[in-house]
Amino acid sequence: ILDWFSRYVLAWELSATMETEFCARALKSALKKATAEIHNSDQGSQFTANEYTSLLEANNIQISMDGRGRCLDNVFTERLWRSVKYEDIYLKHYRTLEETYDGLQKYFPFYNQKRRHQALNYETPERIYCH
């Protein structure tokens, strides 16, 4: 779950499937830290499932979904995952889901606290999000 303004990663989960449960866990974790006016996602079944959308509705968050097959509608999230892949996953060649999870537990704090973004005037996501 990404704050688009600051690029701050509020929460994340990892799964070998595209089931709703792991996405809902990430959303619940993010909602413990912050709420938003709008939640944008693609139209994947995990994001359109009642279990997921009801969490958004219960927190008065407007649901916004990209057009089918339009990855550029969600450009900040797509860019995050490109960074994750090229800066961590492809370099480390994780062999198992558990190794990947452990590696990402180290990467996301780096991404939020240390990785500077040109679009943020070379500030970190944490600095923008917290100030």
Locations of the language-model features?
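Charged DNA-binding/catalytic regions of mobile-element recombinases
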Residues: 1-131
